[in-house]
Amino acid sequence: MFKEMNLNLKQMGNMIYEDPTRIQEEEDIVQEVSTTFSDEEDNSSSCSLSSSMCSDFTEDDDDDDVSSSSSNGPLEDLSDLMSHLPIKRGLSKFYEGKSQSFTSLGNVKSLEDLMKRGFKSRNYGAKRKSSRSTGGILDQSYKRVFSPKATISKKPNRTPSSVLSCLARRRH
């Protein structure tokens, strides 16, 4: 496949440029690219383009390769995946799961306490009823304070231009 590309590039280069030195330079570039691609196919390393860049790149990534090489193939099981994921650190180092409205987890004596407390905190009906009882009063006062006020504005006097012209003539 690469040889076919080389031939096509050479033919295109010969057709476009008649300068023999430029043709030779292009052939050299094409040859370098084709050897680079063939080297990459032969080696599993992706650093065959430049040895100086390759050495810089591999020195930085050596530590990462050691940590990722501890796995034995693809992660097929969820527990394998979980062991490779970073530990999630939140505000509480001692409690994992959904947050509850306990002021201290020391107050929790059993899982039943957690379940009861969780369901009580999810009882939104009582909260909604209490807000409805005071909501009417708050809504009325809010409407009185923030509603647009009725204003009476004077309409500008519109006098016909003929009247204005007459007034202007009388003054002179």
UniProtKB/Swiss-Prot annotation:
Compartments, as annotated in UniProt: Nucleus; Nucleus speckle
Consequence when changing K88A: Abolished ability to confer tolerance to stress (e.g. metals and oxidizing chemicals such as Cd, As, Cu, diamide or t-BOOH)
A cellular component term, taken from the record's GO annotations: nucleus
Signal peptide extent: none
Induction pattern: Lower levels in the dark than in white, red and far-red light. Induced by wounding in an ATAF2-dependent manner.
Quaternary structure note: Interacts with SOC1 in the nucleus.
The protein's name in its UniProt record: Protein OXIDATIVE STRESS 3
Organism: Arabidopsis thaliana (Mouse-ear cress)
